[in-house]
Amino acid sequence: MRMLLHLSLLALGASYMYAIPTEIPTSALVKETLTLLSTHRTLLIGNETLRIPVPVHKHHQLCTEEIFQGIGTLESQTLQGGTVERLFKNLSLIKKYIDGQKKKCGEERRRVNQFLDYLQEFLGVMNTEWIIES
C-alpha cells in the first residue's frame, strides 16, 4: 500500500512537470502574462479593501522581493480557477527566472579591470534607463 502511494505521488509529480511548459521563452511568457493581467484586471481589483504595499520609486529591478510579496498577497485573496490561475502560474515562473538570474550576481572573483568595466556598464544603465531623482 505504501509503495502504491509513493508511485502515485511520483506519477503525479511527473505529470505536473510535463503540464508546465518549461521551454517557453521568457519574453513570450512575459508578453502572455501582460495580456492575462490586462484581461483579468477587473477581477483582480474586485477586493477594494485589500491594501498591498507598492514601492515608492520606479526602479522596479531593485524591488523584485516587494513586487513578488504583493503578488503573493493578491493571489491569496483571489478566487482561483480558469485563466486567472494561469496568470499566477506565469508569475511564479517569472519569479523562478528572476531568482535564477540573481544567483549570477556573485560567486566569481575577477580582476579589478573587469570589475571596473562592469561598474561602468552599470552606471551607464543608471544614466540612460533610470529616472534619477534630485
From Swiss-Prot:
Gene Ontology molecular function terms on file: cytokine activity; growth factor activity; interleukin-5 receptor binding
Gene3D superfamilies reported in the protein's UniProt record: 1.20.1250.10
A family per Pfam: IL5
Species of provenance: Cercocebus atys (Sooty mangabey)
Keywords: Cytokine, Disulfide bond, Glycoprotein, Growth factor, Secreted, Signal
Stretches assigned to coiled coil: none
Subunit structure: Homodimer; disulfide-linked. Interacts with IL5RA. Interacts with CSF2RB.
Name of this chain's protein: Interleukin-5
Transmembrane residue ranges: none
Signal peptide interval: 1-19
InterPro entries, per database record: 4_helix_cytokine-like_core, IL-5
PANTHER family assigned to the protein according to its UniProt record, in alphabetical order: INTERLEUKIN-5
Record's function text: Homodimeric cytokine expressed predominantly by T-lymphocytes and NK cells that plays an important role in the survival, differentiation, and chemotaxis of eosinophils. Also acts on activated and resting B-cells to induce immunoglobulin production, growth, and differentiation. Mechanistically, exerts its biological effects through a receptor composed of IL5RA subunit and the cytokine receptor common subunit beta/CSF2RB.
GO biological process, alphabetically ordered: immune response
Family to which the UniProt record says this protein belongs: Belongs to the IL-5 family.
UniProt-annotated location(s): Secreted
GO cellular component terms given for this protein: extracellular space
Highest taxon listed in the record's lineage: Eukaryota
Gene name per UniProt: IL5
Sites carrying sugar chains: T22, N47, N90
